[in-house]
Amino acid sequence: MRGGEQDLRAGLKALQLELTDSQVGQLLDYQDLIGKWTKVYNLTAVRDPVEMMTHHLLDSLAAVPPLRRHLRKTGQEQGACLLDVGSGAGLPGVVIAICCPEVAVTCVDTVAKKAAFIKQAALALKLPNLSGLHARVETITTLFDVICSRAFASLADFTQWSGDALASHGVWMAMKGKQPAEELASLPPTVEVFHVEQLQVPGLDAERCIVWMRCKSAAAGLDQQG
């Protein structure tokens, strides 16, 4: 058994997340790749492998079951497009690409070396559904079904900057620590929060949640359909 594999498999079991042996191997290879690149390019402040497992991999993996439920509920299990904003080392975008091969994942970052890392990860991990993009999210006009972020910006800035890239039926999926009451209160009236989902990250004694949001116009359309 590889280093970190036991902790990873225990975490997957706690999250009730079933992955193939190949996907487990890809996650471990991804962690190794982050470690190698960080020595040269300082991709992440977390360098200890054990800490990287809990604070990066398992933290990102905790978002996969909620994402899968959303895609299943909305009939987007095949062919959905997801944008990970301010992706950095690819968290959670690369993790999602590994766990959800049917989802086309684009990781965007304003730092060239981080976008280059995503492109290298796509090649090294053999992930045809993953792409890296060096750009400001405000310049993206391609439409996405899900736009996610992890430890990125305030909810107001996140939704404003990425708004032009959100499909009419699309949702924002913001990974946060504890429930961000002030940020929620600062959202514009055009954005609706339809769910705040608490997350339990194995081995991490800290609050985590996902704030699910959509445009008010999209919410009105769903209500009319109902």
Curated annotation (Swiss-Prot):
Record-level GO cellular component terms: cytosol
CDD domains the record matches: AdoMet_MTases
One of the Pfam families matching this protein, by short name: GidB
Sorted UniProt keywords: Cytoplasm, Methyltransferase, rRNA processing, S-adenosyl-L-methionine, Transferase
Gene Ontology molecular-function annotations: rRNA (guanine-N7-)-methyltransferase activity
Similarity comment: family membership: Belongs to the methyltransferase superfamily. RNA methyltransferase RsmG family.
Protein name per the record: Ribosomal RNA small subunit methyltransferase G
Organism of this sequence: Polaromonas sp. (strain JS666 / ATCC BAA-500)
